Amino acid sequence: MDGRNERPTTPVSDFRVGSSEQSQAGVNLEDSSDYRTSNSAESKKGNLSGKSISDLGISNNDNKNVRFTADTDALENDLSSRSTETSDNSKGTDGQGEEDRPARHKRKPKVSFTHLRNNGKDGDDETFIKKIINNLTGNQGGLVPGLAPIPSENENGKDDIEKNNRNEEIPLSDLADASKIVDVHEGDNKEKLEALKLESDVNCTSDGETLGSSSKNSFLAPAVDHFDDYAENNSSDDNEGFIETSTYVPPPSQVKSGVLGSLLKLYQNEDQNSSSIFSDSQAVTTDDEGISSTAGNKDVPVAKRSRLQNLKGKAKKGRMPRLKKRLKTEAKITVHIADILQRHRFILRMCRALMMYGAPTHRLEEYMVMTSRVLEIDGQFLYLPGCMIVSFGDATTRTSEVQLVRCTQGLNLWKLHQVHAVYKRVVHDTLGADEGNALLDQILADTNLYPPWMCVLLYAFCSAMVTPYAFGGDWVNLAISFFMGLCVGSLQFILSQKSYMYSNVFEISASIVVSFCGRAFGSIPRSHICFGAVTQGSLALILPGYIILCGALELQSRSLVAGAVRMFYAIIYSLFLGFGITLGSALFGWMYHNATNEISCPQLISPWFRFLFVPAFTISISLLNQAHISQLPVMVFISCTGYVVTYWAGKHFANSTEFTAALAAFVIGVLGNLYSRIWKGLAVSAMLPAIFVQVPSGIASQNSLLSGLQSANTIVNANETITTSTSDPSSSMSFGMTMIQVCVGISVGLFASSLFVYPFGKKKTGLFSL
């Protein structure tokens, strides 16, 4: 053991570098190009060059993990097998060869220790050197973890304590996900930050002073899939978007980072400065210790880290230019955050406007996805009846912001046209998000074209016009339908708007009032008032035809949750109407025993006169839904064409309501989509009045709405109780089933027409069609 202390020792750091050829030829390892120490002569003298192995304070008690090999040949075989295993496991995960790797990623040549076997004359010395060799060649670093060879899987060249101290039994695939996350956060700034690292070492500036001069890669760097408009390098190659490519607009190759990520970038410099000082202070050692306690951080040599302790006292060169650069970066980040907030606000307001003004519900998610893609926002959308769940993702911080857009769904054809115009301008990049927000705010703040009192008159006129062509009423019934429509319109547009409690029972109360008054007018002797025509005509506008149509379209477009909820609600809604009609008729029958029992009109007007009432009904119902006068010609033309198809198809297919509705809806859809494709109009606003014409016609073809009247006649004539009306479930359910048949046929025809005109969909904007 005395000979060990007398002979000159080789610095411990010499064991980790240098090729076997250099070692055997007697080349000094300190002059090797792979020698990983500082270039400063002072650091070489102050750290390891003057220390021997015995002076490191290593005792036999510390050698708990030392592997003893009694045979020298076994040692050589063990070393050769370990070197082969290390070379196999140290290949890059990206499949690059040794020649394709960057200079800083290439593996260091393994040190050949075979020439050291016979250097010592004492057997104890040889055994002790073997212990050191066995531990140095292991993956865990043995006695001195900082001197272990750097594995090539540490591609980033960063401090990775978890990899350095990991157990050999843990497969490398367990760390694949974490490695991917780190690679994504580093982004395209690896070469840039390496250059800045060298520059910061030359200038002797403080680590963490600015983002650009930091010698450590920023964990919050822009991700590969994102870019910041204030970053110097925002280029990316073939990056895939986050949103699935099931719709027409391809996902953007780059999306904006979120607000939280930008805010963290704003305060990243201060956080990095404090954290770097704390972490580096633990790695700094005194000259008496000679070696760092955290030498396992293999990328930073001990000599370089030892001079970090006095950097704060040195003069900082070029501080003012860096401060100006930092202030400029903060200003750009502030502008970036404002732009992101404007885009988020535009998406939310566009969603609210589309829901309030009657956009096709089965295409709402498609519209919002396309809008977010054009605005380069990572957004996910889920539509439920009455609300839209919006999630704005931020992959930089692995967080998301969830917004709930909830509003009462209505129908406003003119405002829908205006919102669609803003949507098209933003999608085609002719209007910014901030200007779009201003326009949407103005549209939302504008009042309706027609006040409530005018809507009441239009409702009454619609009831009068639908009675002759749909339910067979004569000229006398027009006045009665107008009067009862006036009552229903007052309940809907005046009383329901003022009382929230009454709005929940509006449908039942309206059906009770209409059936009661209709039977009262029909019981007047020699009045020629048709009880069934005036009752159905007055209730035609509150039929759940549009609700069932939206549900059928959603189910056909695979929106199962929204479609199922809407369909079930429409069926229950139909049962409410049927119950109200039965109850109102029975009430008047109990009060007046000579009440009329006729549910069909004895006198019918000429079928050719019916065609005159269709355009009048189309105009009135379009104005009732807040359509502009400029939109009326196209609506009237499409509506009249659809009714002509319905009338002649009903002559040939008398017992097939759904087939007749499908043919008419196909013609309506083709005309509406051609209007959108050729004249660049809004197809949904032109098609909706024509669809409203089809629903009452389909209902009247089977007289399903009169099932409640038939039940009321049975109650009055047989002097039975109301419980008799529930004995025949087929009569109470027939109205809802007829509505479903008509709307399913309409939905099939509309989808077929969209496929006929737009076989491949639209390239950039959503298809604003039913």
Swiss-Prot record:
InterPro entries: ThrE-like_N (IPR010619), ThrE/Ser_Exporter (IPR051361), ThrE_2 (IPR024528)
Pfam family, one: ThrE
Gene Ontology MF, one: transmembrane transporter activity
Signal peptide: none
Transmembrane region(s): 453-473, 475-495, 505-525, 529-549, 568-588, 604-624, 629-649, 659-679, 681-701, 740-760
Positions of the UniProt region annotated as Disordered: 1-125, 139-169
Localization per Swiss-Prot or TrEMBL: Membrane
Keyword Membrane tagged: yes
Keyword line: Membrane, Transmembrane, Transmembrane helix
Membrane topology: Multi-pass membrane protein
Superkingdom in the source lineage: Eukaryota
Biased composition (Polar residues): 49-63, 78-93
One GO term describing the cellular component: membrane
Ranges of biased composition (kind: Basic and acidic residues): 155-169
Residue stretches in coiled coil: none
Family indicated by similarity: Belongs to the ThrE exporter (TC 2.A.79) family.
Protein name, entry field: Pheromone-regulated membrane protein 10
Natural source organism: Saccharomyces cerevisiae (strain YJM789) (Baker's yeast)
Gene: PRM10
